[in-house]
């Protein structure tokens, strides 16, 4: 990732409007800022959320609160708790997210 032509700025995430995305079950609320080619999001998954697709996009993802289960298409699963993160490249392992009780994430892609 190359970050250029981006002056210093501050984001108050509580002031960024949320956009709801339905999952197979539950919903995700995205608060999104776009900085050139870099998308930065604060995301809340509701309890019982299951993503409706296998994602192929690369991300840096940090769990801020709650627990996230990330499943890879090869069957591996990972439980992430607050302070844990993962990183994956574009087109690398297909992955999808779920949570039993809800989770808050910070994602850069």
PLM feature spans:
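General beta-strand recognition
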Residues: 39, 69, 104-106
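Conserved hydrophobic/aromatic beta-strand scaffold that supports enzyme active sites
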Residues: 32, 40-42, 60, 77, ...
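A short, N-terminal "cap"/entry segment at the start of jelly-roll beta-barrel domains
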Residues: 1-42
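Short, acidic/polar N-cap/turn motifs at the starts of alpha helices
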Residues: 28-30, 40, 58, 67, ...
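Ligand-binding loop in jelly-roll beta-barrel domains
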Residues: 77, 81-84, 89-109
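A short beta-strand-loop-beta hairpin characteristic of the jelly-roll/cupin
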Residues: 53-56, 60-82
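Conserved short histidine dyad/triad with adjacent acidic residue
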Residues: 36-55, 80, 89-92
């Amino acid at each position: 990732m190359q970050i250029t032509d981006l002056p210093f700025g501050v984001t108050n995430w509580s002031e960024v409007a949320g956009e709801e995305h339905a999952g197979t079950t539950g919903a995700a609320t995205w608060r999104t800022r776009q900085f050139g080619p870099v998308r930065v999001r604060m995301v809340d998954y509701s309890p019982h959320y299951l993503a409706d697709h296998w994602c192929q996009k690369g991300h840096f993802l940090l769990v801020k609160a709650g627990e996230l289960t990330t499943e890879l298409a090869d069957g591996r699963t990972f439980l992430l708790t607050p302070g844990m993160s993962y990183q994956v490249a574009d087109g690398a392992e297909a992955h999808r997210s779920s949570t039993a009780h809800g989770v808050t994430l910070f994602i850069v892609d």
